[in-house]
C-alpha cells in the first residue's frame, strides 16, 4: 500500500503542552521497540528502503518501506510474524514481502531476479519509543495522530525522539495537511522528512540514500492547467522539503542552504508564471518565501566570501582580510527555516499540490498557449535588456539574471508540452549566459562586501580595487553571451 504521512518535529519545551492537548481526546498508549536491518554493504538504505522488526504490545510485526511518489508518500508492507511467546525477536525474512511493490523494490535494490535467494541481513540500530495516538475525523478524512517520545540507539550512542506523525487512514491528503497546519501554528512544530530510520543510519554511521535533486514534473502531454500546476508545484516542493528538513535540524552545510534557495526560487517561478492556469494559488505565499530566500542568501554570500573569494584575492597577491565582521548580522539558518510563517507556507503549498480543482481549470489548448506566451515574454525581456547589459545599472542587470533563471525553470516545467529534444537543446543553451551572469553577480556582491569592510579594515581596499577593475570586462562578457544566446531558436515557435 502507499502511505501518506506527515512528520513534525517537536521542540523540547513544547512536548508537555502537546502531550496535555493530545490526552484530552480518546488516546491509546503503546510502547514500540524496533530493530532495523540491512545488508552488510547497506544496499537497502542506499535505495531509501527500510526493513524493521517491531514489537507492538505482545505482537511482532515485520515492516518494509520504500520511496513513493514525493517526499511524503511511502510504499509500505506489514507482515504479522506472530505473538511474543519465547521472549526473543523472530528472524527477519525478506521473503515475507514477496509479491508486493515493496518486495519488488527490495529485489531491484539488491539486484536479484525473481526467485533468487535473499542475502543475510545485519542488525544496525534500534528505536524505543512510547506512542500516544488517537484517530480523528477532519474534513472528509480520517487521520491518525501519533506522538512518539523515546530514543534511537546504535551501540553506545543515542539520540532523542520527539515527533508528531499524522497518517492519513482514509480520505484526502490535503485534510491531513490542514490538520498539521493547526499543530504547527499552535505548538511551533516544523515539517521534517528525516525519518527515524534516517536518524538511525546517521547515528550508526551506515550508508543512506543520496539526497535527490530537483526532479522533472510528471504530467501528461495533453494535461490541463490544474494538473500541470499541481504536478510542477509538487516537484518543486520535494527538494525544498528535503533541504529545509536538514537545515531545520541544524545543518549549515553550504550545499543544503544553496539547494534550498534554488528550490525556493524554482517554486516562486512556478507560482508566478503559472498562476493563470488554475485557481487556488494564494499571493500571500510569496512573502514568506522571499523572506526565507533572502535570509538564507546572506548566509550563502558570506560563506562564499570565506570559501571562494578570499582565497582568490590572496592568490592575486592581495592581503588576507578577516571577513568575520560581516557575520554579525547573518541570521541562524535553522531559525529562519523553522519560522512559523515559512512552515505554514510549506504546509499550504503541500495542501495545494494535493488538492482537486474547484473548477476544471484551463484546458490543454489554452494551457499550452498561455505557457508559450509566458516563455516568449521572458525570452523577449532577457534579450531586449541584455543587449545593452554593460550600460544598465545594477538593479536592471540583476533583473536580467532573475528573468533568465525564470526562463530556464519555466522551460523545464513546460518540457512535457513540447518536443523533448528541442526543449533540452534550448535549456542547455541557457547555461553559458547563466554562468556569465552568475560570475558577474558574485563579484559584484564581493565588491560591495569589501567596500563595506574597507573603512575599518584597510586591507580590504585591495579587493575593492581588484573587483572594480574586473567589473566592466565581465559586464561586456555578459552582454556578448546575450548576443550568442539570441541566435538560439526558441523551442516553442
Predicted regions mapped to residue ranges:
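Function-determining surface determinants
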Residues: 1-493
Amino acid at each position: 500500500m502507499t502511505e501518506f504521512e506527515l512528520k513534525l518535529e517537536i521542540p523540547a519545551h513544547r512536548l508537555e503542552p502537546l502531550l496535555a492537548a493530545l490526552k484530552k481526546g480518546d488516546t491509546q498508549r503503546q510502547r514500540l521497540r524496533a530493530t532495523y536491518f540491512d545488508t552488510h554493504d547497506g544496499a537497502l538504505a542506499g535505495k531509501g528502503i527500510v526493513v524493521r522488526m517491531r514489537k507492538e504490545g505482545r505482537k511482532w510485526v515485520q515492516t518494509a518501506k520504500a520511496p513513493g511518489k514525493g517526499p511524503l508518500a511511502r510504499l509500505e508492507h506489514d507482515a504479522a510474524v506472530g505473538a511474543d511467546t519465547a521472549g526473543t525477536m523472530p528472524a527477519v525474512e525478506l521473503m515475507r514481502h514477496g509479491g508486493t511493490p515493496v518486495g519488488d523494490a527490495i529485489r531491484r535494490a539488491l539486484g536479484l531476479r525473481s526467485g533468487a535467494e535473499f542475502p543475510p541481513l545485519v542488525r544496525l540500530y534500534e528505536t524505543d519509543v512510547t506512542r500516544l495516538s488517537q484517530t480523528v475525523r477532519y474534513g472528509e478524512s480520517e487521520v491518525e495522530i501519533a506522538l512518539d517520545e523515546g530514543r534511537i540507539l546504535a551501540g553506545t550512542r543515542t539520540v532523542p525522539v520527539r515527533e508528531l506523525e499524522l497518517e492519513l487512514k482514509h480520505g484526502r491528503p490535503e485534510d491531513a495537511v490542514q490538520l498539521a497546519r493547526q499543530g504547527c501554528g499552535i505548538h511551533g512544530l516544523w515539517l521534517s522528512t528525516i525519518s527515524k530510520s534516517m536518524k538511525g543510519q546517521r547515528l550508526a554511521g551506515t550508508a543512506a540514500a543520496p539526497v535527490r535533486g530537483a526532479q522533472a514534473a510528471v504530467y501528461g502531454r495533453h494535461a490541463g492547467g490544474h494538473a500541470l500546476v499541481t504536478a510542477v508545484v509538487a516537484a518543486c516542493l520535494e527538494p525544498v522539503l528535503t533541504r529545509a528538513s536538514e537545515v531545520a535540524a541544524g545543518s549549515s552545510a553550504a550545499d543544503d542552504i544553496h539547494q534550498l534557495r534554488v528550490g525556493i526560487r524554482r517554486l516562486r517561478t512556478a507560482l508566478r508564471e503559472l498562476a493563470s492556469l488554475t485557481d487556488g494559488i494564494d499571493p500571500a505565499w510569496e512573502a514568506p518565501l522571499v523572506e526565507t530566500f533572502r535570509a538564507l542568501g546572506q548566509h550563502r554570500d558570506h560563506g562564499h566570501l570565506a570559501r571562494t573569494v578570499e582565497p582568490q584575492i590572496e592568490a592575486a597577491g592581495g592581503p588576507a582580510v578577516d571577513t568575520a565582521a560581516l557575520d554579525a548580522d547573518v541570521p541562524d539558518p535553522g531559525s529562519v527555516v523553522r519560522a512559523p510563517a515559512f512552515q505554514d507556507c510549506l504546509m499550504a503549498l503541500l495542501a495545494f499540490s494535493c488538492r482537486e480543482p474547484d473548477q476544471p481549470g484551463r484546458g490543454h489548448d489554452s494551457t499550452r498557449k498561455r505557457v508559450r506566451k509566458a516563455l516568449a515574454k521572458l525570452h523577449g525581456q532577457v534579450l531586449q535588456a541584455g543587449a545593452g547589459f554593460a550600460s544598465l545599472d545594477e538593479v536592471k542587470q540583476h533583473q536580467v539574471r532573475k528573468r533568465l533563471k525564470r526562463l530556464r525553470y519555466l522551460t523545464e516545467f513546460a518540457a512535457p508540452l513540447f518536443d523533448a529534444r528541442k526543449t533540452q537543446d534550448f535549456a542547455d543553451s541557457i547555461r553559458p549566459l547563466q554562468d556569465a551572469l552568475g560570475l558577474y553577480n558574485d563579484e559584484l556582491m564581493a565588491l560591495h562586501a569589501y567596500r563595506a569592510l574597507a573603512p575599518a579594515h584597510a586591507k580590504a581596499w585591495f579587493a575593492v580595487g581588484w573587483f572594480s577593475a574586473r567589473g566592466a570586462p565581465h559586464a561586456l562578457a555578459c552582454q556578448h553571451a546575450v548576443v550568442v544566446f539570441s541566435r538560439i531558436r526558441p523551442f516553442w515557435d
